[in-house]
């Protein structure tokens, strides 16, 4: 643990952009080397334009998968960069501009992935919304609650529901992105933390229900990771000290999360792994 600033104090307007971060995150652009663990597969990564989603898209592509990913209109510069990185790995990118708080958009994400890339092997439910708050709980707005729940929970359920019939054909797998907030919730992120705890429960339940179909369902719980979500949703001083309270004394990079997703997606490496949450937290416990 350390009290030393980790990053320059900074803020952005949500949802945040990679190019406006100082320093820019490491998504594995220069470091990730694939070994063919997902050769010939197709993955759909929600919120895959930046942060952990981009790192996962890069890693999956370098492991041999074509990658579809969703993004919001404001995130197009990041989405274009991610698509180029997937294509640079010799795989086919499919960038889908969709707001997953709409059920029809979740259905479209899955439908277009299968229609344009031919199949679906891996679903990564990564898209999320958080916003640190200063106000009292009694001032919590319905709009804030609705956006957090729809982005983090409804979209996950809708997208997974649409994906299951296609995943049964392979069979494939689902990987949910949860958070250390499910275990050590921050008061300022009450709604976000609650959705992440719910995702843990959903992961276990879906693993039990879909296991007989051969579909594995797991989750990754990142700790404080240097992504656009941080300067776009936290106070500048909080951003500066991101990760300083972890046992490793620093924030993680998206590139340090991606191998966990690759492991869980691999039909050989994780063939008997289902219903678990894998922590990538810098030493913070996830039990």
PLM features: what roles do these ranges have?
Residues 160, 195:
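Active-site helix of classical SDR
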Residues 165, 208-212:
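Alpha-helical segment proximal to the catalytic Tyr-Lys
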Residues 179:
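Residue(s) in the substrate-gating loop at a strand-loop-helix junction
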Residues 1-27, 219, 241-269, 273, ...:
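C-terminal helical subdomain
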Residues 76, 97-110, 142, 255-256:
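The beta1-alpha1 cofactor-binding region of Rossmann-like NAD(H)/NADP(H)-dependent oxidoreductases
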Residues 134-137, 141-146, 242:
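Substrate-binding pocket helix/loop in short-chain dehydrogenase/reductase
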Residues 135-136, 185-193, 205:
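Active-site loop-to-helix junction immediately N-terminal to the catalytic Tyr of the SDR YXXXK motif
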